Amino acid sequence: MDETVPQSSASVHSDSQKSLTQSSHMPVITQRTRLSNRLIDLRTPTMQAVILIPSIICHEFRQYLSKHEFIEIHTPKLQGGASESGASVFDVAYFGRSAFLAQSPQLYKKMCIAADMRRVFEIGPVFRAENSNTARHLTEYTGLDLEMEINHYYDAMSLIDGMLKHIFTVLRDKYG
């Protein structure tokens, strides 16, 4: 920072926008340009929606399940062994030993149900080491996972139906 230049906390705000030039079409902005100017790109309505929508979905998922007596759990993401049989895993060097990134919280959710917790959920990262050689395949994503005791599969279907309707209604009413 140049100390000879006076610093100010002032900002410029505008109540309106007016285009100074006329254009018949919007310019094409490449992904490389967008990534090179990431802070500007993140200010666009589209990119802000990319951040906002998953945040709302996770919030409403959590709220809905909490109202239906679910307990939120947080399961380990580094494990001493592969948790899913036959699937590829991410092997991580961990203080001189091997560890693996968790593929899902399934084992821990089942343990909670067996321990009479009845209803549990987790929002957290999931890692899949499947080599699909496609840009459309995610090896890491945020999972919205739930587990519950049921007497009939209609119990689960009814809960999930209500939850999805709730989430989509909130998205439509607040942001649609």
Residue ranges and their predicted role:
Residues 1-176:
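Class II aminoacyl-tRNA synthetase catalytic cores and aaRS-like
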